[in-house]
Amino acid sequence: MEQTFFMIKPDGVKRGFIGEVISRIERRGFSIDRLEVRHADADILKRHYAELTDRPFFPTLVDYMTSGPVIIEVISGEEVISTWRTMMGSTNPKDALPGTIRGDFAQAPSPNQATCNIVHGSDSPESATREIAIWFNN
């Protein structure tokens, strides 16, 4: 049974999509192994987004991710990583297909604004292990 890390980002929490996102996970047959409400800080975001810290948009990303609470979860199931990523949709909301979480609910960014794409999911088993350790063994 595969596990992955996922997060409902501040825009998803603020806009009231927690129940919808969790319902989609449960309807797909995945198990929720852990769930917490957190307020992210710059330190944890630097570890989570380590490959992005030198990018010019990183401060905007930190501002967005610290703008409100996030919901962090560990979910499990058969092929959960690839299936969850498909369910989320394309990272850029304008490219996300209808029927995906981002396609149905995310908003394309304005200039100088972070991409408010509602959810995050690990992209590989290695990323899942690393992100679970960062957020739950903090």
From Swiss-Prot:
Gene3D superfamilies: Nucleoside diphosphate kinase-like domain
Domain of life where this protein originates: Bacteria
Location relative to the cell: Cytoplasm
Gene Ontology molecular function: any one: metal ion binding
Residues binding ATP: 9, 57, 85, 91, 102, 112
KW rRNA processing (keyword) present: no
Record's keyword annotation contains Metal-binding: yes
Transmembrane segments: none
InterPro entries tied to this protein: NDK-like_dom (IPR034907), NDK-like_dom_sf (IPR036850), Nucleoside_diP_kinase (IPR001564), Nucleoside_diP_kinase_AS (IPR023005)
CC cofactor: Mg(2+)
E.C. no: 2.7.4.6
GO CC terms, sorted: cytoplasm
Active-site positions on this chain: 120
CDD domains xref list: NDPk_I
Gene Ontology BP terms: CTP biosynthetic process; GTP biosynthetic process; UTP biosynthetic process
Keywords, comma-separated and alphabetical: ATP-binding, Cytoplasm, Kinase, Magnesium, Metal-binding, Nucleotide metabolism, Nucleotide-binding, Phosphoprotein, Transferase
HAMAP family: NDP_kinase
Similarity-based family: Belongs to the NDK family.
Self-association state and partner proteins as the record states: Homotetramer.
Name of the protein in its database record: Nucleoside diphosphate kinase
Organism of derivation: Streptococcus agalactiae serotype III (strain NEM316)
